Amino acid sequence: MRALRAPVLVMGLVLLICTAAQSDASANKVEKTLRRIMEIMRQVENSADDESAQKTESAPEPKDTHHLKTASGETILEIFPRDLSRKEKFITILTGRRLSNPLRHQSCVFETSDLVVFHPSGPLYFGPKCKKDVYRLYHNTRDCTIPAHYKRCARLLTRLAGTRKCQEG
């Protein structure tokens, strides 16, 4: 819509200038004004191109990373916390253990055939039918995305692991 306003505005200005220009003396002013308007339009177009180039540069990576496979051919599900600086705290709460090098571990990798999450009460096993539920719970609930609610997230994952659907397979 913003792109539509600029040409309409320019056309209005050109029409106004053309109707106001009645003598040869004002014709030079009109030409100068038209040149100035054209320069402004070029600047607007260049800035719009620069903005779109910046948006495309910051575009997210392709979804090819979701199709990672293990040596046995099973798909790997990677879970990334929203705030990577809090990764160590999240792992500490869920596992009860500290990571030796938190910068080295950028994601929790789970095999989809048997998802395993380590929890203070022991490891949680998720069957292959539960992959989508674990992914949705981890990424789409505020309990697993807000650092203050990580204990709730651990409780929800524990409850999910106890369901019939996740224990099958």
UniProtKB/Swiss-Prot annotation:
GO terms for cellular component: extracellular space; plasma membrane. GO terms for molecular function: cytokine activity; receptor signaling protein tyrosine kinase activator activity; receptor tyrosine kinase binding. It comes from the Eukaryota. Disulfide bonds join C130-C166, C144-C153. Residues 1-25 form the signal peptide. Keywords: Cell membrane, Cytokine, Disulfide bond, Membrane, Secreted, Signal. It is found in: Secreted; Cell membrane. Residues 52-67 have a biased composition (Basic and acidic residues). Expressed at high level in the notochord and iridophore stripes of the trunk, as well as in the eye and swim bladder. Residues 45-68 are annotated as: Disordered. Disruption phenotype: Fishes show reduced dense iridophores in the light stripes of the trunk, particularly in the anterior region, resulting in irregular interruptions of melanophore stripes. Fishes lacking alkal1, alkal2a and alkal2b are embryonic lethal and display total loss of iridophores. Homodimer. Cytokine that acts as a physiological ligand for receptor tyrosine kinases LTK and ALK. Required for neural crest cell differentiation and iridophore development during embryonic iridophore development and adult stripe development by acting as a receptor for LTK. Belongs to the ALKAL family. This is ALK and LTK ligand 2a. The lineage of its organism: Eukaryota, Metazoa, Chordata, Craniata, Vertebrata.
